Design a protein with these regions (language model features):
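Broad phosphate/nucleotide-binding scaffolds in NTP-utilizing and phosphate-metabolizing enzymes
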Residues: 1-206
């Protein structure tokens, strides 16, 4: 319900900013996009370069929107501990110490930590509630498609294939796919001293 309310706020803010171009409205819009979850943030990341090519967007606004790439909201350490326990059937602290957040992206966040021998390790965890957020996003798209004037306007001004986006998003939310890509590149560049692919230790979907 909270997520749906955030989408409703965005639907009000978008046309309001379009007709006024007030900087404050843009900042509030950006804040609400960050609160709306992984799907909409990734959708913005995915669509902004395409729209920029089509419409030559204001570069100052593009720079602000770059916050959506590297400065997304962090989820809690408690959630990370829970997901690690669920997937590997042991506490994260059994093997690792000095766990600290490095960065948070649209789909997951990365930690730096050390194993018991002191070797540095990176850990990536998918953000919570992504399945729910995806269903909400698809429901909003369904409702938009029911209103012909809105649907036609979006297709005219925003000619982007949403099916491709949703397939790409689903692929990225499964870390096993990322692990397979890691192994593929490690094999491809195993004899190249200038390209170092991180060694994969263990993996789960989340």
């Amino acid at each position: 319900m909270i997520l749906l309310f955030t989408y409703i706020k965005l639907m009000v803010l978008l046309p309001l900013y379009y007709f006024t171009e007030y900087e404050m409205i843009f900042d509030v819009l950006l804040l609400n996009i960050k609160k709306s979850g992984s799907v909409l943030i990734k959708f913005c990341q995915w669509s902004i370069p395409r729209l920029n090519e089509m419409y030559n967007l204001d570069q100052k606004k593009i720079q602000k929107l770059e916050e959506l790439y590297e400065r997304c909201n962090f989820h809690s350490m408690e959630y990370t501990e829970k997901i690690y326990q669920k997937n590997f059937h042991e506490s994260i602290y059994k093997k690792y110490d000095s766990i600290e957040e490095i960065a948070s992206g649209s789909i997951g966040q990365v930690y730096r930590m050390k194993d018991k021998e002191g070797e540095a390790i990176a850990l990536k965890i998918i953000h919570p509630n992504i399945d729910c957020e995806l269903r909400t996003f698809q429901y909003i798209l369904y409702l938009i498609n029911l209103v012909k004037p809105i649907r036609d306007s979006i297709k005219y001004y925003f000619p982007i294939n949403l099916t491709v986006f949703l397939e790409d998003f689903n692929s990225q939310t499964n870390l096993i796919n990322e692990a397979n890509n890691n192994l593929l590149f490690a094999s491809m560049y195993r004899n190249n001293e200038y390209i170092i692919i991180p060694e994969l230790i263990t993996v789960s979907k989340q």
